From Swiss-Prot:
Record-listed E.C. numbers: 2.4.1.182
Lineage of the organism: Bacteria, Pseudomonadati, Pseudomonadota, Gammaproteobacteria, Pasteurellales
UniProt gene name: lpxB
Function: Condensation of UDP-2,3-diacylglucosamine and 2,3-diacylglucosamine-1-phosphate to form lipid A disaccharide, a precursor of lipid A, a phosphorylated glycolipid that anchors the lipopolysaccharide to the outer membrane of the cell.
Keyword annotations of the record: Glycosyltransferase, Lipid A biosynthesis, Lipid biosynthesis, Lipid metabolism, Transferase
GO biological process, alphabetically ordered: lipid A biosynthetic process
NCBIfam families: lpxB
The name this protein goes by in its record: Lipid-A-disaccharide synthase
Length: 393
C-alpha cells in the first residue's frame, strides 16, 4: 500500500475539453490527497486548480492531418520534453487526458520505465482502427471510459478499463428547464423553435449548412410559426455559416447564437444536428433529434470500410438500437431531413406519444451514464496509486 500523503501526480491535456476534465479530476483528487503536487501540460482551468504546466496546452491543440503535419516538428519536440521531464521527475502516476496520438506514446515510454499510467477518455477504438487496443494495453495500467459499451469492448481484449460515467451527464439536469433556457437566450417561451447545429469544424459547416438550411426552408412552409436557433462555436464559424446562408437561403430568418448550444436544444422542440458530442448533449437535453452527416466521397468510402459499428450517433450506440434517425451522405438531403423532423413537430396524439416515449428513453440513458464522473475518476486514480486494480467495476 502507498503511504505517501503527498503524491506527485502528472497530467497532460491537449485541448479545452481535456482541460475541463483535468480540472475536475484535480479538484476531486485533492479530497483524497490535500498535499498532492500536480505537474504536466495544463490549460487555464487545470492551472487554476493547482497544476504546474511545462508549456501552454494550446501548443498541442491542433486538429486535422494538414495541421498536424505542419506542426509535427514542434509536437515531437514537446513530446520528447514531456517524456524526459517525467522520467526525471518520476511521478507516482501519469494521467494522459484524451489526445491519444500524443499521450499514448508518452504513456508507453513511462509505463516501460515503471511509472504507473492511466489514459482518461477512451479513443474510439471500438469504432475503427481496433488494432490500437494492443498499444493501449502496452501503454496503460487502466483506461477510464465514459460509456459502458467502451468498457465492454476493452473487456473483450482483457485490457483493464473502468466505466466512470460521463461528465456531461453530471452537468445537465435530468429534467431540463425550458423556461430558464428561453430566458437565458432572450426568447419568447410561447414560440416554437428548432435547433440547428451544423458542427464545430469548418468542414462540417461546409458540408451540412446547405442541406440543413434547405430542410429549414421546407419546414418553414409547413410550420410558418417555426423559428430556427443556430448556435455556432465561434466568430469564424458564424461568418462561414452566414456566407453559405446568403447563397442558399437568404430570405430565411434564423437566430444565430455564439455558443449556447445546450440552451438552444433545451428551448427547442427538436434538433437537427451533426453526429458527435452534440448528439449526446442533445440526448441529455431530452431533445428529439435527427442526426445528419456528410463528408468527402473518398472519406465516406473509407469510413464505410473502416467503421465497425452499427450506428454513428452516441444515443443509438448507447441504446444499441435506432432511437434517432441517422441520415448519412446522400440520405442527408433536405427532403429526408425535413420529413423526419416533421415527425417531431406534428401535433397529433400519436406523434406526441412517440416524442414522450423517446424522451423517456433519453432519461433512462442519462441515468445510466450519470455517475459523478470526477469522483469516479479520482477513485480510480487512488486505486491504481495504491495498487488496488483488481476490482475494475
Amino acid at each position: 500500500m502507498m503511504t505517501k500523503e503527498a503524491p506527485l501526480i502528472a497530467l497532460v491535456a491537449g485541448e479545452i475539453s481535456g482541460d475541463i476534465l483535468g480540472a475536475g479530476l484535480i479538484n476531486a483528487l485533492k479530497l483524497h490527497y490535500p498535499n498532492a503536487r500536480f505537474i504536466g501540460v495544463a490549460g487555464p482551468r487545470m492551472i487554476q486548480a493547482g497544476c504546474e504546466t511545462l508549456f501552454d496546452m494550446e501548443e498541442l491543440a491542433v486538429m486535422g492531418l494538414a495541421e498536424v503535419v505542419k506542426h509535427l516538428p514542434r509536437l515531437l519536440k514537446r513530446r520528447k520534453q514531456v517524456i524526459e521531464t517525467m522520467l526525471a521527475e518520476k511521478p507516482d502516476i501519469f494521467i494522459g487526458i484524451d489526445a491519444p496520438d500524443f499521450n499514448l506514446t508518452v504513456e508507453e515510454k513511462l509505463k516501460a520505465s515503471g511509472i504507473k499510467t492511466i489514459h482518461y477518455v477512451s479513443p474510439s477504438v471500438w469504432a475503427w482502427r481496433q488494432n490500437r487496443v494492443h498499444k493501449i494495453a502496452r501503454a496503460t495500467n487502466l483506461v477510464l471510459a465514459f460509456l459502458p459499451f467502451e468498457k465492454a469492448f476493452y473487456d473483450r481484449f482483457n485490457v483493464p478499463c473502468r466505466f466512470i460515467g460521463h461528465t456531461m451527464a453530471d452537468t445537465i439536469a435530468l429534467k431540463p428547464n425550458r423556461a430558464e433556457a428561453c430566458v437565458g437566450l432572450n426568447l419568447d417561451e410561447a414560440q416554437r423553435y428548432l435547433a440547428i447545429l451544423v458542427g464545430s469544424r469548418a468542414s462540417e459547416v461546409g458540408f451540412l449548412a446547405e442541406p440543413f438550411l434547405k430542410a429549414a426552408q421546407i419546414l418553414k412552409q409547413q410550420y410558418p410559426d417555426l423559428q430556427f436557433l443556430v448556435p455556432l462555436v465561434n466568430d469564424k464559424r458564424i461568418a462561414q455559416f452566414e456566407q453559405i446562408k446568403a447563397q442558399v437561403a437568404p430570405e430565411l430568418s434564423v437566430h444565430i447564437l455564439k455558443g449556447n448550444a445546450r440552451q438552444a436544444m433545451i428551448a427547442a422542440e427538436a434538433s437537427l444536428l451533426a453526429s458527435g458530442t452534440a448528439a449526446l448533449e442533445g440526448m441529455l437535453c431530452k431533445s428529439p433529434m435527427v442526426v445528419g452527416y456528410k463528408m468527402k466521397a473518398m472519406t465516406y468510402w473509407l469510413a464505410k470500410r473502416l467503421v465497425k459499428t452499427k450506428y454513428i450517433s452516441l444515443p443509438n450506440l448507447l441504446a444499441d438500437e435506432m432511437l434517432v434517425p441517422e441520415l448519412i451522405q446522400d440520405e442527408c438531403n433536405p427532403e429526408n431531413l425535413a420529413w423526419y423532423l416533421g415527425n417531431y413537430l406534428a401535433d397529433d396524439a400519436d406523434h406526441r406519444k412517440q416524442r414522450n416515449e423517446l424522451k423517456q428513453r433519453f432519461t433512462e440513458l442519462h441515468k445510466l451514464i450519470q455517475c459523478d464522473a470526477d469522483a469516479q475518476a479520482a477513485q480510480a486514480v487512488v486505486d491504481v496509486l495504491e495498487a488496488n486494480t483488481s476490482d475494475q467495476n
